[in-house]
């Protein structure tokens, strides 16, 4: 196995109180000199020139999926992270910015220029592009047609990893039955079939997503996210929400209890938790299986998660869930596969509330940093990507350090548009932020607090929910075979590289994998 090494370059600069250290280089926040920029470029160049490919087998694979994490989202979140630390922001770095291998993913699906999270999950987890709105089935399946899914089911990187004897897990801030995590284990003609509330009247007898997880995948050792409502009976009471009559199960099954019974029958030391205190009490060293359902529906936005007035029961952060998952899964000598989704980036964008989306993206970066810190690049492949883009853009010519959530400005002077009214740096092409005043004028936001969490960025086209974007999205990777993610890839290739690197699925015998694994 090739070993990565770096030369060490020490650069000393005279810096101000607000300087930022990144990759050994101090950024002073718009006071950099020509010499500074030359030295910064040399340091970055030498680091990349001295890097070496890691071509061994990936014992472990962690996929971090930022739902809706478009390139503008990455850029704006990077700036926000820097500004939250008291710096100008542009020179900051998200945890995965430092990964040595980057590429682009083409996200269109089989029948749509702009994909959704269901068909995209099928691509990057199952290795096959499929029709919009479907999960874990090939393109023969028509959206919503239960009968057409029979015989068209696909397997995923989770299946391939389990077949190789690895431990597997999933972590998300959405419902664990939502499109991204469901791509690991479910096969449905309609992503909306999360519980039998939706499938009870569908001809063909297709099983809902929650039931597929509990019935067909008892060996998924870590499951964390939200979505208790689809696992509980309709007559049960949720500990936070109360009545479950609307979304609860009509088949009389208590899937949480069934999960417990199944783990008990397999002689596993298991835990089911639904709040932060119970989560914090878990000792990963003696835990075999963990089911954590921390919300009735999706988990809270990161900006609201720590607000006791908003979230009384408490929820772990995405980074904390990532840490616990790795601690549990890493005990398997054959390795593990873990999917971690920052799912509410997408929801913030759909609502037209950029602040919520960006704060969730910063929290997602923290989770990636946790995974990077806890693992070794010599045996663990980490790949970070998004499933699709959004329509948010970074516009105008704001000065360096201008509040990324604020109005475009130079100093105290707001930048005026053609209608002589100010505008924010972040805008959406469509969404709920569209509005006109009497006389069909764009609203004047001069005295509006655009940094408030409830503020809707202005949009050009009226939509109840902002749409996805068809842009390519970034891929950031480190570890064994991470160099295979360079260039422009079809989204379905992402799954194949993970399988190739870890010697599972169709690639279990490539390049004498058996011999390489035997020598570990």
Outline where the language-model segments fall.
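Classical eukaryotic N-terminal signal peptides for Sec-dependent ER targeting/secretion
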Residues: 1-11
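N-terminal signal peptide
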Residues: 11-26
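A post-motif C-terminal structural segment
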Residues: 20, 28-42, 54-59, 69-75, ...
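Structural beta-sheet core signal
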Residues: 63-64, 170, 384
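Alpha-helix C-terminal capping segments
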Residues: 125-127, 159-165, 216, 374
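His/Cys-centered metal/cofactor-coordination and adjacent catalytic loops
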Residues: 136-151
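Glycine-rich phosphate/pyrophosphate-binding loops
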Residues: 153, 158, 163-183, 508-511
């Amino acid at each position: 196995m090739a070993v990565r090494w770096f030369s060490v370059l020490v650069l000393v600069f005279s810096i101000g109180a607000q300087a930022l250290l990144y990759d050994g280089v101090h950024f002073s926040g718009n006071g950099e000199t020509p010499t500074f920029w030359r030295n910064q470029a040399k340091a970055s160049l030498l680091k990349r020139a001295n890097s070496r490919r890691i071509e061994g087998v990936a014992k472990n694979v962690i996929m971090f999926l930022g739902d809706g994490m478009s390139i503008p989202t990455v850029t704006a979140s990077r700036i926000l992270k820097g500004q939250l630390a008291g710096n100008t922001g542009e020179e900051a770095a998200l945890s995965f910015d430092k990964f040595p291998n980057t590429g682009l993913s083409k996200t269109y699906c089989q029948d749509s220029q702009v994909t959704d999270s269901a068909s995209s999950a099928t691509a990057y987890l199952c290795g096959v592009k499929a029709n919009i709105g479907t999960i874990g089935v090939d393109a023969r399946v028509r959206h919503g047609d239960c009968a057409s899914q029979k015989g068209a089911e696909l397997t995923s990187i989770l299946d391939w990893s389990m077949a190789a004897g690895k431990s597997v897990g999933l972590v998300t801030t959405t419902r664990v039955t939502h499109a991204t995590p469901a791509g690991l284990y479910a096969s449905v003609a309609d992503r909306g079939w999360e519980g039998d509330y939706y499938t009870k009247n569908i001809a063909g007898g297709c099983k809902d997503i929650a039931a597929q997880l509990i019935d067909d995948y008892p060996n998924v050792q870590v499951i964390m996210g939200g979505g208790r409502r689809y696992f509980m009976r309709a007559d049960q009471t949720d500990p936070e929400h109360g009545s479950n009559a609307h979304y609860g199960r009509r088949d009389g099954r208590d899937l949480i209890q069934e999960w417990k019974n199944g783990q008990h029958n397999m002689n596993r030391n298991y835990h089911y938790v639904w709040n932060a205190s119970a989560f914090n009490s878990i000792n990963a060293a003696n835990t075999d299986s963990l089911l954590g359902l921390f919300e009735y529906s999706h988990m809270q936005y990161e900006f609201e998660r720590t607000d006791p007035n908003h979230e009384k029961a408490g929820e772990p952060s995405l980074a904390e869930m990532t840490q616990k998952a790795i601690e549990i899964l890493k005990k398997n000598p054959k390795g593990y596969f873990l999917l971690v989704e920052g799912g509410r980036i997408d929801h913030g964008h759909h609502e037209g509330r950029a602040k919520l989306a960006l704060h969730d993206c910063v929290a997602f970066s923290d989770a990636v940093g946790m995974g990077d810190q806890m693992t070794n690049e010599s045996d663990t492949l980490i790949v970070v990507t998004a499933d699709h883009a959004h329509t948010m853009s970074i516009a105008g010519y704001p000065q360096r350090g201008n509040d990324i959530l604020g109005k475009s400005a130079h100093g105290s002077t707001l930048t005026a548009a053609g209608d002589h009214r100010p505008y924010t740096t972040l805008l959406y092409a469509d969404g709920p932020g569209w509005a006109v005043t009497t006389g069909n004028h764009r609203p004047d936001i001069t005295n509006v607090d655009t940094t408030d969490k409830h503020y809707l960025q202005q949009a050009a086209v009226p939509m109840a929910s902002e749409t996805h974007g068809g842009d390519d999205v970034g891929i950031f990777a480190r570890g064994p075979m991470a160099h295979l993610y360079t260039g422009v890839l079809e989204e379905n290739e992402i799954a194949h590289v993970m399988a190739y690197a870890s010697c599972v699925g169709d690639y279990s015998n490539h390049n004498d994998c058996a011999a390489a694994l035997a020598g570990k």
